UniProtKB/Swiss-Prot annotation:
Placement of HEAT repeats on the sequence: 7-40, 44-78, 109-132, 138-165, 174-206, 215-251, 259-294, 303-363, 365-399, 403-443, 445-484, 487-527, 529-572, 575-617, 619-694, 697-740, 747-786, 792-858, 861-899, 907-939, 947-987, 995-1026, 1045-1073
GO MF term set: nuclear import signal receptor activity; nuclear localization sequence binding
A biological process from GO: protein import into nucleus
Protein family according to the UniProt entry: Belongs to the importin beta family. Importin beta-3 subfamily.
Oligomeric and partner information: Interacts with Ran; interacts specifically with the GTP-bound form of Ran (GTP-Ran), protecting it from GTP hydrolysis and nucleotide exchange.
Role played: Involved in the nuclear import of cdc25 and mcs1.
Domain of life (superkingdom): Eukaryota
Organism per entry: Schizosaccharomyces pombe (strain 972 / ATCC 24843) (Fission yeast)
Name used for this protein in its record: Importin subunit beta-3
Amino acid sequence: MSSGFPPEVLSPLLNLVQGLSSPDNTVRNDAEKSLSSDWISQRADLLLNGLAILAYQSEDPAVRSFCLVLCRRISFRTLPGDSELEVFSSISNESKQSLQSQLLACFVKESVPTVRNKLCDTIAEIARSIYDCQGEWPELINVIFNAVNSPDESFRESVFRTITSLPRLLSGQDSAVTPLFTTGLADPSIRVRISAARAYSAVILESKQSTRDQVIPLLPSLMNILPPLQQDRDSDNLADCLMAITEIAEVFPKLFKPIFESVIAFGLGIIKDKELDNSARQAALELLVCFSEGAPAMCRKSSDYTDQLVLQCLLLMTDVAGDPEDEAEELQEWLNTDDLDQDESDANHVVAEQAMDRLSRKLGGKTILPPSFTWLPRLIPSQKWSERHAALMAISSIAEGAEKLMKKELSRVLDMVLPLLADPHPRVRWAACNAVGQMSTDFAPDMQVKYPSRILEALVPVLESPESRVQAHAAAAMVNFSEEADNKVLEPYLDDILQRLLTLLQSPKRYVQEQAVTTIATVADAAAKKFEKYFDAIMPLLFNVLQQADGKEFRTLRGKTMECATLIALAVGKQRFLPVSQELIQILGNIQMGITDSDDPQASYLISAWGRICRVLGSDFVPFLSSVMPPLLVAATSKPDFTIIDDEVDESKYSEQDGWEFIPVHGQQVGIRTSTLEDKCTATEMLVCYAAELKADFDPYVNEVLTSVVLPGLKFFFHDGVRSACCKCIPQLLNARILASNRDPAKVNELWEPILRKLLDHIQNEPSVEMLADYFECFYQSLEISGLNLSPSSMEALVAAVDLQLKGFISRVQQREEEAKNGDIDIEEDEDMILAVENDQNLLNEINKTFSVVLKIHKTAFCPFWERLLPYMDGFLSGNDTVAKQWALCMMDDLIEFTGPDSWNYKDHFLPYLAEGIQSSEPEIRQAASYGIGVAAQHGGELYAEICSSALPALFKMLELPDARDEEQIYATENICVAICKICRFCSQRVQDLDKVVTYWINTLPVTHDEDDAPYAYTFLAELMEQNHVAVASQMPTIITILAETFASGVLRGRTLTRLMEASKVYLARFPADQVNSVIATLSVDNQRALSAHF
């Protein structure tokens, strides 16, 4: 075996191996140095071959195993001083062939299963490297196919283990694949059958289609492995096999279509089988749930899938109580624990909750609600606390996916949930808090607007529960409710809420204190100025926590307290905060100077806290920048923490609580520390805050932030939040430079030119639709702020990028339509599809805004470039996709608005669609078309006057629709109202019976939602009142009602509001006071207050 290998090498090599495995740190460190400097650098070929020989010759299985692991690890290390070249690639071809031969000899000889496993892993990785370099290893193929017939089951198992690691081994062996797996899946040894199942899954997932086609017919044989495992109660192997099948189902769910009903029946049988371990039952649940994500239509068509799976999920969710004899002890343990983050992810009830959430989000409310609400009304009043708990957690789980339909029945759902906030069992009350919190997020703002009293009157008393965990969860639910609540909703309850939260702040449980502080912060944020009365009582308590709560265990509490104090400062405003601001700044400065540990959570809280203080103090914060910016820049420029470990290595030092997440790659675990990514994102967001708030005062930092943080951050692909924050930072940095330099062209261009190059590159090449929208938003905001002209080459690059992205949009739309046609997806129910459509719509909106700004700056000079996109606009306008048609109409609207009469040159492309669009059944199309008619009247000149005036009958007709003022229609309705206003103002000579038309128009008011268009309507109304036009003179009660609703809505501000108020005073003064007052008396109290506040 070792023929030709220098024997004098083996002895020192064996010593090296023994040194590397020594428990003595000194011995091991010396061996590692020798490995790198003496062996890898000088004798890599002898090292790898020697390890293989020792793996063959040694009588000690532990030595053989370790040599094989070393051989694999070292082969794929990079050489010292060369970051590209791996050790295996660096050795000669002769040495490679020798190593291959030695490994195959080991394969034939090795008899210990655990060592064989290490050997297979090493062989697979060496083979992968050979194949990646277009090499071949025919001897391995021969050994593999010979070993499948070995009488030794460990040899047969090794065949499939090797194939699992490297399915490419079977490339070009199509004729032999079917017999190989037919034999393996029917092997008498369960170990071999399980190994064959894993290999089958890998081949399906990673092989070419020709190889895949050979094994697909064997899918029933794969499934046939399962029943004997269930019969034998072999839970571990059953779970392994189910996981291998799940991997196939996740990618190719439709392969199971011919046997889907059988798969459902078997999977449900496993879930029901309480004699099996939870691992097997959960694996079966995972298999069935994954079909909802990959083939929702197939699941909807099954008669049993949803009904039976929901029932089994609910039954698993009742598995929260444990054994009756242990129930009291387990409850006490649950109540007493201080570790609220303890991992329950493998508990049946948690797995089932997650399954319900996934089913709801993928199948939608129409499918998931009927079976759910068949059982929930029976579980809610159950005598068993575990069933009441399951019902509440089920409501929490399905709320997001079934949001639209559940909102319609929200009152009835609250009837089920709210009484259980007073349940005698603490875990039920905890679950009720959980449901209220989840619903407050998923059903916002309906929960806060329609049912605030019912919710708060039930939730606030739970803050006084005797159990700390229930108190904390009630406070957490209050956070969710308050985040979406108006301060008017909270005001009547603030005394009760804060009195209880301040009591919780004195709790002996630190997690209760932390939650109380967080909730106070959120309530303050929502209450805004209404929180002022509590400022003097609460701030000293928070300062005391920051100064007195010492020790590592209090770091998170202090961090949350920083958050609370600075959110309160934001809520009450600068003048109220100013007297205590220096004290808080001093406290935070001391904390910052005391941070020495890299994992101290206070550091990330400080980053945000300084940002909030900056927002409150504005330019008064500038003196503190020199202290705040250095650690902020360190965090914003930080690199991600990576590690690569082998499967055998203990992962405990890379815990999830420390922010580590791992994915398996080629037999190794690749980890990234996500907590550092979040800190980097927060730091970048704070730079946006500083630049936006301090403006010119931030200019000394602009260059450094741009070059070291923002431009590199645009391609920080590990975290989209970082890239998004960088996009938001660019316009603010430009604005800071513009203000500081008094628009000095040289200084502004110094910043703008590298930004422009980067942005044009990203909007052309970025694959993420969501990020593309951010890049376009950054582009047009930067242009708008700077007012800089684009060069012809930049205009060309912009249009070329948009051309490419529109092609991508069309492709995605076509794919969704094809999938919907085939029944693969339900675009209205599938949450992922809804999000994909929203992302595309958002992207088109941002592209439209980009062109709007470019047209506004360049006018007709941009038209030759804009014209390149006419084929897309023509296609979208004549097509049926609402999103695309709306985008094309908006593009035409901007053309009319910013090029005026010159837009007439393109009239044939859009005029028919404007006329057609104002009568569309789709509100988005009506809104875009009516806006176009309005801007044509305002900016198009005489060429458009006749067309605009002739549109009036159709416009008025659409305002008469019974649902014209419904939530989904209101913006279209208000755009039509404003379009009529513009026609009357700018095309009055073409309008027949103008006074009559204006009188009708008055009755289409008010405009209370569209803040962009409202000024046009109310400027016209003010003119009419100033002129005492007949249309207003004869409609005093109507005018008063319009004014009251307008003022109450807050839709107007600035000069338009001032002018309307002055015109209203003059107008109403023309009428007897008693007549005016009698009309006002008929208004609602809120509208009366709004009128009073504006006169």
